[in-house]
Amino acid sequence: MYSIDVPFEYSSQSVSYLEGQLREMVKMLEQVTGKKMDEDKLKEVIKRENKTHAYMNRYIDVLRYKCHPTTLTLEMYMLFVTHTFMGTQQTLRFFEILMDEMESFPDSKAKRVFWVHIVPFYPHGLKRYFNYSQHYEVLGLDLNFDYLEEMDCDNPYRALAIKMILNHGNGPYQRKIGSIMNIIDRLQPDGVIHFCQWGCKQSVGGMMLLKQMLDERGIPFLALDGDGADRRNHYEGQVNTRLEAFLEMIGKRERCL
């Protein structure tokens, strides 16, 4: 096992420190497996990731006004292509197809919500309101847009180190707020829902800071407490009551475009 220490702050020194760890990890894997790392293939992966990021940024710009039929589960499962399989030909093709589809969709007339943190997959109330709905649409999860910058494919280890440090899940919570607000400025949602997973300090601990920023912008905000993994800790009635009140509130507001 090799444990990577990702620095909290971003600086030239912290990037070099993390880059050194990545190179050391590769050497360890080469010794264990008896296989040599092909850096040219790694560079090709970074190139595909850059192409994918370009499609993702186009997707965000089009999503601002286009209708995009989706479900909460599909948005959560998109984490596989934006993280686990990022840099593969399949992920690049996924976003190429998605962009082709988006061009054919009509402009949206629904009230639109941006989701922060994970989506619980089992609550029927949430599914009833958002899945393939003509009235309320989920524009996406912040987790899928946590790093969209172009990477230096000629220096893949350093590029990966920068990506890991600047990911909005790392470092001060202000970094995450800045990343989320950047996406919100581009998507212009009618409201934001933050799911606060029980025991998740990364999300619950900074939630009020995000709420304060959204309040200053006049963007409606709803925090839903729950457990995305264990339905026994989910209170359907309470969640539905708060969600319905929130949707009624944004329903009375003029569209934010």
Which role does the model predict for each range below?
Residues 1-39, 141-257:
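Trp/Phe/Arg-rich N-terminal binding region typifying the photolyase-homology
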Residues 19, 23, 27-150, 169:
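A charged, amphipathic alpha-helical module
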